[in-house]
Amino acid sequence: RYFGAAVPAFKLSDSQFTGILDREFNAITPENEMKWDATEPSQNQFRYTSGDQIVSHAQAHGMKVRGHTLLWHAQQPAWVQNLSGSTLRSAMMNHVTQVATHYKGQIYAWDVVNEAFADGGSGARRDSNLQRTGNDWIEAAFRTARAADPAAKLCYNDYNTDGINAKSTGVYNMVRDFKTRGVPIDCVGFQSHLGTTLPNDYQTNLQRFADLGVDVQITELDITQGSNQANMYAAVTKACLAVTRCTGITTWGVRDNDSWRSGDNPLLFDSNGN
């Protein structure tokens, strides 16, 4: 099992940040450096400098890399917004192929698709330009990623799926269908951006996915500061340890001031690195 953190490339020059990272963590998720807008800012013109920097740091310190993320409705480059239908679909699959091929053999697990299910009680797919290319786009992405990098574990990643609810059940049904039909999916990521309470069926939910024959991973953990914060970090860790196929936990940053929700002081280290 691993314990990881999300890392932006520019923080690798911050000695306090890297000191904690290299001492306490053994896996890295690039925060933004492998997203579509970063890696293919213009169509068919790929840019990997920042992502490569993160991979190099990980390799130098014996850390795993979770690739994040090949296809997502957000943080798309402007040119993608002008495409639709089969033109967009082919650009999507070309992007998956090119990026996964560039990092072939260097990525422990890829978030192939991120956040493709709707919030609320429908359990349905989120409407997006990706979804409008046809409901089979997720399957196509996983098959394309497997062809490009057969050794990487291929994950589906989402948020608000931390307990058993309509959204997590929608994801569950997709994963079950994929496993039944032999679509290559190896893991499911649970972002776990949490408030002050943990769903009481958190571990049960992880286990039901594991029972489908996939690994489960906590991928973007952060927890609102308060009297329950330490207890919740412990509870999430214990839940993962109790599920044999829960292969690791990643916190979404290192120090509170690194966090996208820094006002919540949600991470394990404070802004002074303590």
What are the language-model segments listed below?
Residues 1-31:
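Boundary/entry segment of secreted carbohydrate-active catalytic domains
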Residues 5-9, 30-32, 67-71, 111-114, ...:
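A cross-domain feature marking catalytic cores of carbohydrate-active enzymes
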Residues 6-18, 36-49, 76, 117-121, ...:
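Acidic-and-aromatic substrate-binding clefts and catalytic sites of carbohydrate-active enzymes
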Residues 20, 71-73, 261-265:
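Short, flexible, mixed-charge acidic loops at enzyme active sites
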Residues 23-43, 47-162, 208, 225:
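Substrate-binding cleft and catalytic face of glycoside hydrolase catalytic domains
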Residues 49, 53-64, 132-157, 164-247, ...:
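Glycoside hydrolase catalytic-domain groove-lining segments
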